[in-house]
């Protein structure tokens, strides 16, 4: 996306007159207890698989560690460190500038198919979404929740319009409405933001449970299980 296109995108403000944010302290308490208990159980169960995956990543590319740590923007704009299994080469961030012209997403988001920076084991981890599992530690620490808008990069948030920043009203999550959309990379940035605003207005325990089950179904279907 060119600078001119990005500036044009930023100046087009969607109609959010129907958006309404309501604090839900009881739901937030239930959500935090659920996140804390389930993430702890997952950490215990996945401890050995985490070690095995880490070793495989190191064998595939020894130039960097198995865990990728990056700044992300959380609730109310607070910055936190997100954890993921490393799926790209050690100098992936340095190569980003030369790949920007191939960006397949609109808005302040970068995604391309067949990214040349992805390692062999990284392709497998991404195809199964296993690379996202270390975010369970973020959930346990309270940086994230199982359900909520996906956490954005600080440089992306800097380009947000006021309507886009509404997604920062709640704790970011591991999955969301956008995450379970078929061919989600074909979803426009504005549609993505609208899905996040929809979740913020409608959020409740039943929606969270449905999204968690939909995510598991989506992953199993995607992997052919």
Regions found by a protein language model. Give the residues of each.
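Cytosolic nucleotide-binding catalytic cores of signal-transduction proteins
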Residues: 126
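Short phosphate-engaging motifs
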Residues: 51, 95, 117, 132, ...
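A hydrophobic, helix-centered structural microdomain
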Residues: 22-92, 210-225
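Juxtamembrane loop-helix boundary motifs flanking transmembrane segments in multi-pass membrane proteins
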Residues: 14-29, 113, 117, 152
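Short, glycine-rich, amphipathic interfacial segments at transmembrane boundaries or analogous
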Residues: 3-10, 67-116, 175-194
